[in-house]
Amino acid sequence: VHLTAEEKSAVTSLWGKVNVDEVGGEALGRLLVVYPWTQRYFDSFGDLSTPDAVMGNPKVKAHGKKVLNSFSEGLKNLDNLKGTFAKLSELHCDKLHVDPENFKLLGNVLVCVLAHHFGKEFTPQVQAAYQKVVAGVANALAHKYH
């Protein structure tokens, strides 16, 4: 991902304030509610029958945290996202057979959640930088697909 020094600074300074537990669960939960077909990858998560069930599901929250911890690793390696996400790309492609389009959806949902959490601090410039990052991460995760 090609970010200016200003964009990198905006992304990293905001990310330092992110509560990964809270935002991760909310982002994954919203993905599962807004795009219900994504639930098929989470059969083992139990009750996902209503928005409240999804948002309160401890497995959704735990996996959301895991997803954002990986995203944090990506932020530390913006110049090598494909390398950073190579193993996860392989896992999601070969073993889990996740539609790579879902990575883009989750990235966009994450941007919405960050906007919701940070309000005025999430300026259009910050959003533009985050859109570049989530697109880069989605692209890196889709890299191993044939």
Curated annotation (Swiss-Prot):
Q: Which UniProt keywords apply?
A: Acetylation, Heme, Iron, Metal-binding, Oxygen transport, Phosphoprotein, S-nitrosylation, Transport
Which InterPro entries did the record assign?
A: Globin, Globin-like_sf, Globin/Proto, Hemoglobin_b, Hemoglobin_oxygen_transport
N6-acetyllysine carried by residues = 59, 82, 144
Q: Residues where N-acetylvaline occurs?
A: 1
Q: Which domain of life is it from?
A: Eukaryota
Give start and end of each Globin domain.
Answer: 2-146
- GO biological processes: hydrogen peroxide catabolic process
Phosphothreonine occurs at 12
Q: In which tissues is it expressed?
A: Red blood cells.
Protein name, per record: Hemoglobin subunit beta
User: What taxonomic classification does the UniProt entry list for its organism?
Assistant: Eukaryota, Metazoa, Chordata, Craniata, Vertebrata
